[in-house]
Amino acid sequence: MSRPRIGFLLPHYPRRSTSHMPLVMRALADAGAIVDLVHPTGRTVDLSQVRVEHDLYVLRKMSGLALSLAGALHELGAAIINSYPATATLRDKIVSFRILQAAGVPTPATFAASHPDELLPQLADGPLVVKPYQGGGGHGIRVVRTAAELAAVPYDRHKPLFAQRYHAPDGRDRKIYVIGGRVFGVKKVFPRRTDADKHGEPFTPAPELREIAVRCGCAFDVDLYGVDIVESGGQPYVVDVGSIPGFKGVADAVQLLARHLYAAAERAARGEGALSEVLS
């Protein structure tokens, strides 16, 4: 069988980045795959020359040119992990949380608004967590308890506001990572300031948390993802689902990801679809 070709659409990583992805690319090449960096390349893209040239594309970047290129490749029939539609959906918390609710995933009460003032009545029932409706990584998250704090929330009239009921955590947040149906748990603090905070403490997820994580993956038909869970009063609440996160704290993450992507590329080359059988 010919060597699988895998193209990566990635963020711009700084030289001292601790991301696993450059190491995953190296591991795939060592395993015999032909690995190319499709984005970033530092040059203009001639859209007429965009065509499917790889058995599999790995979409790690959730915005900008990389996401748009993934959309173009998707329309041309490319196999992408995670798929362009799923990645675009997960980028929008308003859309993704309605999907999670419909799938029976436990989430905090969730609200969308056009202006901070519209959220004021919700404070009567307790604090809110206000966060950007797009993006991730814990950026721009605020716990709002008063009208004054709500008025201080940065506001762009061209973008909606996204808010959830705040539930005080029983302890550290539970980060559940899934690699092709394999479930890994890491306890993490928020906000994460040090490398130790980012790697957290591995733990074995209880069956309830495993089931929640798998249900999240099935809701979006994704193979590589992370689920943020806050446990409050013994009740788990999903507060975020991310496409292809950093997998920090997962033992042997580089090799696990490389093996999964290599197998997915082989399946895609045979026309069988890139997703693992666990979620197909």
Tell where the protein language model's regions lie, with residue ranges:
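Phosphate-binding site of ATP-dependent enzymes
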Residues: 139-220
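Short glycine-rich anion-binding loops that position phosphate/pyrophosphate groups of nucleotides
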Residues: 62-64, 134-135, 244
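Rossmann-like NAD(P)H-binding beta-loop-alpha module
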Residues: 108-128
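Protein kinase-like catalytic core scaffold
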Residues: 128, 162, 184-185, 225, ...
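Conserved N-proximal alpha/beta basic substrate-recognition cap immediately N-terminal to
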Residues: 5-109
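Short beta->alpha connector loops
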Residues: 40-43, 61-65, 113-117, 167-169, ...
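A short beta-strand motif that forms the metal-chelation/ATP-contact edge
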Residues: 54-58, 176-178, 235-247
